[in-house]
Amino acid sequence: MFLYPSMTNVSLDLMEFVETQILPRYNAFDKAHNLAHVNGVISRSLTLAKKLGADGNMAYAIAAYHDLGLEGPRAIHHLTSGKIVQSDARLKRWFSAEQIRVIKEAVEDHRASASHAPRSIYGKIVAEADRDLDPESVFRRTIQFGLNHYPEKDQEGHWQRFLEHMQQKYSSHGYIKLWITNSPNAEKLQAIRSLIDAPEELRKVFDRLYAEETA
């Protein structure tokens, strides 16, 4: 059984259900959204839930279900994840109808490009936890996604796609939003932005990680 910090707030039977029935589905996804990714989101969600006094079972379930919609089209995966929550009657063992509604909405609200603030503290927790903003992890994930989805591109093509994605999502005018004040992600996002503003340095990082991922 995978142990996270702050696990004391999660029911053991819920944990067993998630680890045997839900998490294995992430093995079918790309490297940027695999089992390691969802485990990281769970760990960060539980830490934030404890800090904010939120329910551990709720935060755990939301994190576990948040990307299941990647079994369908990526562009609407957050909405598909919400439908998966709503249709999974097994959740009634641990949660009331109202709690399941909140779980569904939080899963729908987790996406970085969402134009509105998450509707509950749980949506803010999973949205924040989904942002693993360690700079090297962000850069590596972006390269991995490009290699997986655009295998026809050469290194220069991947660099141009990488740079465009950095500008659109992570730059000072990018669409990423942080919903929890003074979270650990704020400092990490600033480090990413500093590198975006220094393209020659960013290219060195890209070339190193690209070489590692294509070795």
Language-model segments: residues:
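Divalent metal-dependent phosphate-bond-processing catalytic cores, especially two-metal-ion Mg2+/Mn2+ enzymes
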Residues: F2, S6-N9, N27-L52, Y65, ...
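An amphipathic alpha-helix signature
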Residues: S11-E19, I42, M58, G82-Q86, ...
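Small/polar-rich, solvent-exposed N-terminal microdomains that initiate assembly or binding
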Residues: E19-A28
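Hydrophobic, well-structured mid-protein blocks that either form specific transmembrane helices
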Residues: K83-R119
